[in-house]
Amino acid sequence: MAETGVDCIALAGDVGDATVCARLVADTITHFGAIDILVNNAGIIRRSPAVDHSEEDWQAIINVNLSSVFRLTQHAGRHMIAKGRGKIINIASLLTFQGGITVPSYAAAKGGVGQLTKAFANEWASKGVNVNAIAPGYFATDNTEALQKNPERSRQILERIPAGRWGEPEDLAGAAVFLASAASNYVHGHILVVDGGWLNR
């Protein structure tokens, strides 16, 4: 991006750590002077039957997938409220609406992301800050690699998707641009599903 002339910085850190979340927001504001758009996109997944799901896996996934959303939104939101505007986009999931199989902590976290989106929106809509979410369906990413490589499971998934294919990252671009732009100024607490029609069935 820097080669195109865009002013940018790359910040790294484990967003499962509360102090890192605070630092990332502070460093961004120090560099740019403001935060206009926050996309909460960090996520991990660990698969195991609920009866075997470890406390370590539970805590790791809740910290990264849910607690970081609260922390980053809170820190960035304080700044946005002070200036009277801002856009926050949380990445939810189909498991915001469904329970899933062998992913209890992931489902719990993504359900929480949906509720946090609405809770923040209820408080901040009148302050000029839009808080919404995108719920991707089955996308061809590292998180779904095990499913893609399982012929039977992949077939079952594709048979249910009316669009007949796995989603690609670029399929999310339109939703993200809409929620980050002035076109969504009257949209608050909405979870925009991008799933090829999965939830219709």
Name each model feature, range by range.
Residues 12-24, 55, 170-171:
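The beta1-alpha1 cofactor-binding region of Rossmann-like NAD(H)/NADP(H)-dependent oxidoreductases
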Residues 93:
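Residue(s) in the substrate-gating loop at a strand-loop-helix junction
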Residues 98, 177, 188-201:
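Short C-terminal tail/terminal secondary-structure segment
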Residues 49-50, 57-62, 157:
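Substrate-binding pocket helix/loop in short-chain dehydrogenase/reductase
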Residues 53, 98-107, 119, 144:
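Active-site loop-to-helix junction immediately N-terminal to the catalytic Tyr of the SDR YXXXK motif
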Residues 73, 109, 117:
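Active-site helix of classical SDR
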Residues 78, 122-126, 185:
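Alpha-helical segment proximal to the catalytic Tyr-Lys
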